[in-house]
Amino acid sequence: DAYTNLCHAVQSGQMDKTVIDTAVCRVLRMKFEMGLFEHPYVDPKIAAKTVRRKEHIELARKIAQSSITLLKNENSILPLSKMINKVAVIGPNADNRYNMLGDYTAPQEDSNVKTVLDGIITKLSPSRVEYVRGCAIRDTTVNEIEQAIEAARRSEVVIVVVGGSSARDFKTSYKETGAAVAEEGSVSDMECGEGFDRASLSLLGRQQELLESLQKTGKPLIVVYIEGRPLEKNWAS
């Protein structure tokens, strides 16, 4: 409702109209410099040849690899041996493509994005990997923690992928103001990105409960965070 309130602020004298004019001019100037007034639309044929070129994919992979930060490696558990017999891959971010991507990412083909689970299966094999979601990022009604515990007990090591999400629901409808219309009974994973503020740095939903339950199994536990904003990691450390 920011735009509606902005109109009220101008009408009531709380906001000077020149402030808005200045902000609008910046946007229009940039569009002019980019030639968007003369050529507002992209040529689909040119776009198809430009987007996802080999060198772009290689650069994106390099950036993603460089962004990974190892915070702790207790007992030198990493790197894992390729001879390991069974790995449990658990967590709401272990096999969710859009949760790995930033805000305003365009709709993607599944083949364009590899999840953590995809990568582990590639290195091992489907028969040596057991996946359970465990819980959602925010929705507390999603509870597969018991299934996750059982999978952990059957495995030699547990990789749990938690964190946050900037994933937008492309089926979401919007008000005239641009605000999303929330459907009753639905809780998206999105907790980061435009329009999302938080009062806590803790994991949301049942994620902390999932971590503590897996730790109690006594199996070696590797915790991976995929997040778009800083999250508290004191328990995991």
Model-derived regions, located:
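C-terminal non-catalytic regions of proteins with extracellular/luminal or membrane-system context
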Residues: 1-17, 29, 58-237
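Conserved, charged catalytic cores of large soluble enzymes
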Residues: 25, 29-32, 36-49
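A broad, low-specificity signal for short, low-complexity segments enriched in glycine/proline
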Residues: 46-50, 182-185
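Metal- or metallocofactor-binding catalytic centers and their adjacent structured scaffolds
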Residues: 52, 56
